[in-house]
A protein has these predicted regions:
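Active-site SXXK
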Residues: 39-42, 56, 62, 89-117, ...
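Short, surface-exposed loop or secondary-structure junction motifs
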Residues: 70-74, 128-337, 350
Length: 622
């Protein structure tokens, strides 16, 4: 994918210009007024969104305006958030540091952004779908085509090269076709930093970003001496907070492992904004502009991806940003380059992104207001023409081939429901968030009372997907029924259970009859052992697959072997039956009675492999 600034210009030419609203805006240059606004907002909205603790910091025109903390770093201990003392994990905002490192090496002409990444990989290769080359630019914009993947995320740390080599996910899209957020892709960029610079990723980030900016509290590894905030998930039904475990993510460090006190974000944001004494501290002006420019979107009018940053929806000023999620921490960095303004929010509650997004909207409304928008349809679509756009959709960011592929079938992801509410008008409902869009042109809808955009497109397979300006890192597909997958699996399991009961009864009867001449006794014994292994495997597979966010648990590893052994035993059963049938040692009813369980036994392991309930490892066992 070509790297060009033209796409950004095109985007700006098709987005409507906004004038200031008649209401008087708050003064962004009045720090006292800004601080009062922020204090009032967080005092009110943290309870609304059930956020235990938060910290925020603002910079403008090369100066740190203020940092503030709200709520609790630890609910049990009643420890309050202190912006100068409390450490938060920043999650995927780490990706902006990785992207900055890549841009530094690009600036030094050590990396070609349009080069095949295999030029920088040592000891292994990555090939795109249909053998198309994956470029550095593809990794930066999340368009390499990787499937979702986080196996062994918190396993024992390995050298980055080794982990990248052994944990490459499947490819589901050709490079440059769709944006599908990828932690593996950014971890791979971290390895490219190592390969090109000759330093470890940790060393490079420390020597070329953290140290030059004086970010003394920032670290890529957990420091037990730091006052790290606890993080929490909120249960709305029970109205309770649950402390979340600290997940070690060293194997994906370049994708989300940084933690720090919030004032350390000040010099980093100022360096990204090329302001004050931090001008050229990390990158030259033209390199910063290239990093912040739009390099991918499905349509020029949509907000899109830069390198390590994505665009906000159109407002008075263009903004770029990045969010972060790890454990119960939710982080957001928001930059308005034209204004030399930036702020970062740290929260330790799982609803933090809802608070962050609401703050961004409210902040712009008060400090950079625009005139009210009332878009009308420019394309007349009949009720019949609207039908293809409606339905229930889910994000394409799920396991298509990896471990946990069955997850969306038994635990459906969040859905987005789209309904036609009139000619050329769509209502989009995602959770409690509702938007109305009107048709602007074929496959393009614009928010009726806002600046968001909804765009539909066909994939290479002919499937209908859509994407939103407000969420450019994801696409959405129509939700399919889970019934066929569940029904076939349930049928196989019921056959195994029923045949196990019959085999046990048969064995007990055989003990009393002492029928030593039975030709089927050896087969029944082998089949019974195989069934018992399956019955052990199934609860392990279904119970523990969701724990694979970290290191694979021991019970799940046992399931890998038991499934493989059961399958091999059923191959033996099938061969034994063929032998008996050839010798005409069994009658028709006996053959019929055992052929169905044998087929079920032969199909159950492949079924579990297909849905990755026992994972790809079982193939190597077999």
């Amino acid at each position: 994918m070509a790297v060009a600034l033209i796409a950004t210009f095109m985007m700006l030419t098709v987005v409507p210009k906004y004038s200031l609203a008649s209401a008087e805006a708050l003064d962004i240059n009045n720090t006292e007024q800004l601080k009062k606004y922020v204090d009032d907002y967080f005092a009110k909205e943290m309870d609304t969104y059930h956020i235990p603790g938060a910290a925020i910091t603002f910079v403008k025109d090369g100066k740190a305006l203020f940092s503030a903390g709200y709520g609790y770093a630890d609910l049990d201990k009643k420890t309050k958030v202190d912006p100068n003392d409390t450490v938060f994990r920043i999650g995927s905002v780490t990706k902006t540091f990785t992207a900055t490192a890549i841009m530094q090496l690009y600036e030094q002409r050590k990396i070609d952004l349009n080069a095949d990444i295999n030029e920088y990989l040592k000891g292994f290769k990555i090939h795109g779908l249909n053998n198309k080359p994956v470029t550095v630019s593809n990794l930066l914009t999340h368009t390499a085509g990787f499937d979702e993947y986080y196996e062994d995320l918190s396993a024992k740390p390995e050298p980055l090269q080794q982990f990248m080599k052994t944990h490459a996910p499947a490819m589901i899209n050709e490079p440059g076709v769709e944006s599908l957020y990828s932690n593996y892709g950014y971890a791979l960029l971290g390895y490219i930093v190592e390969s090109v610079s000759g330093e470890t990723y940790d060393q490079y980030i420390q020597n070329h970003i953290l140290n030059p900016l004086g970010m003394k509290t920032a670290t890529l590894h957990k420091n037990e001496n730091d006052h790290i905030a606890s993080s929490y998930a909120y249960d709305a039904a029970k109205q309770t907070y649950t402390k979340q475990p600290y997940v070690i993510t060293d194997n994906y460090a370049p994708a989300g492992n940084l933690s720090m006190k919030i004032p350390d974000m000040d010099p980093y944001m100022m360096a990204q904004l090329q302001s004050g004494s931090y001008h050229n501290a990390l990158l030259k002006d033209e390199t910063s502009q290239l990093m912040q420019a739009k390099h991918f979107s499905k349509d020029p009018s949509l907000s899109g991806f830069g390198f390590g940053l994505w665009e906000d929806i159109p407002r008075q000023h263009r903004a770029v940003m990045h969010g972060g999620t790890v454990d119960g921490f939710r982080t957001w960095m928001y930059l308005i380059p034209e204004e030399k303004l930036g702020f970062t929010i740290f929260t330790n509650g799982s609803n933090g992104h809802a608070l962050n997004q609401a703050f961004i909207d409210d902040f712009n409304k008060h400090f950079y207001p625009v005139a009210p928008v009332n878009n009308t349809a420019k394309l007349n679509l009949s009720e019949e023409a609207m039908k293809p756009y409606t339905g229930t959709f889910i994000s394409t960011r799920y396991f298509h081939y990896g471990i946990g592929r069955f997850g969306p079938k038994i635990s459906p992801p969040a859905t987005t429901v789209i309904e036609a509410t009139g000619p050329s008008e769509l209502k989009v409902t995602s959770g409690s968030h509702v938007q109305t869009f009107v048709a602007e042109r074929e496959n393009m809808f614009v928010e009726k009372n806002g600046s968001d955009r909804l765009f539909y497109y066909k994939t290479a397979k002919g499937d209908l997907h859509f994407t939103l300006s407000s969420y450019p890192m994801s696409s959405y597909e129509r939700q399919t029924s889970a019934i066929p997958a569940l029904a076939s699996g349930i049928a196989l399991v019921l056959i195994i259970i029923l045949s196990t009961i019959i085999l046990i009864i048969s064995a007990l009867i055989g003990m009393f009859k002492k029928d030593a001449k039975s030709t089927t006794k050896p087969i029944r014994r082998v089949a019974l052992i195989a069934n018992i292994l399956y019955i052990v495997t199934l609860p392990l597979a279904f119970t523990y697959w969701n724990d694979l966010f970290g290191a694979a648990p021991t019970p799940w590893k046992i399931a890998l072997y038991t499934a493989a052994i059961a399958f091999v035993l059923y191959i033996i059963v099938a061969l034994m039956w063929v032998s008996l049938i050839k010798r005409k040692s069994v009658n028709g009813w006996v053959k019929f009675g055992y052929i169905i369980p044998t087929i079920a036994g032969l199909l159950l392991t492949p079924y579990m492999i297909y849905w990755n309930l026992v994972g790809k490892f079982v193939l190597s066992v077999m």
